[in-house]
Amino acid sequence: MKRAENLVRLEHVQEISTSNINYLVYLSFHRELKKAIKSFAKGRLLDIGCGNKPYEIWCSEFVAEYVGCDIIQSSANKVDVLSPANSIPLESSSFNTVLSTQVIEHVEDHQGLVNEAYRLLRKDGYFILSGPLYWNLHEEPYDFFRFTKYGFNHVLEKAGFEVCEVNANGGAWATLGQVINHTFDFKNPKASKMVRGLKYIFRKLRLFVVVNKLFSYLDAKDYNTINTMNYVVVARKK
């Protein structure tokens, strides 16, 4: 199977609504990503794994140019540079900002992606990076890695970056709620008739809305990141 045959890219920014089954991660992920873009995005920006550039709208007021790189052309033909993430045919030290959201887990040579971001950035440029600690399998079989905050620190510092921020997206309660939503949403043909019935009721009654409201409330009342779903990380090229 060719890499492109099972590759999915985000078409647009997902709506933050309790009717979205992934509400619990988007609630905090979007908040932290917007903050990082507002604080650190500037000048020429390269989006590695850009797809249809869903976050360009958030960056437009802060950057002078938005360049997108991906391994295949997107459905809306938004990709400017077609190349692997670890070997991008662009001039060194030519960008002020590099952005890569929810891509690093799909790159087998993830250190190569981080090294390329470092090479392409100008001195004192910023790398805004995000990736999961918890998420269900997706884009199989090209779903290679999950990262703790220590894992992100390691790969960034190994490339030469100074890590500025590592922000968790959701605490333990939000993570538990997201696991519940994913488990009930997954249609497993091997499940027993009883379990399939329970999952059908969960979906039919839209109980994920209840889960989203309850577990976001619990997360706010008992916030801890011993378990979290995702991280938004900012690093500076020294």
PLM region spans:
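Residue-level signal for alpha-helix termini/capping positions
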Residues: 37-38, 122, 157
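Residue-level signal for short amphipathic helical patches enriched in basic/charged
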Residues: 40, 105, 147
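Active-site micro-motifs of SAM-dependent methyltransferase domains
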Residues: 73, 87, 105, 135, ...
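Short conserved AdoMet
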Residues: 41, 108, 122
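A short beta-strand submotif of the Rossmann-like class I SAM-dependent methyltransferase core
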Residues: 100-103
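Conserved N-terminal segment of class I S-adenosyl-L-methionine
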Residues: 1-93, 97, 114, 224-231, ...
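S-adenosyl-L-methionine-dependent methyltransferase catalytic module, highlighting the catalytic core
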Residues: 19, 108-112, 116, 126-237
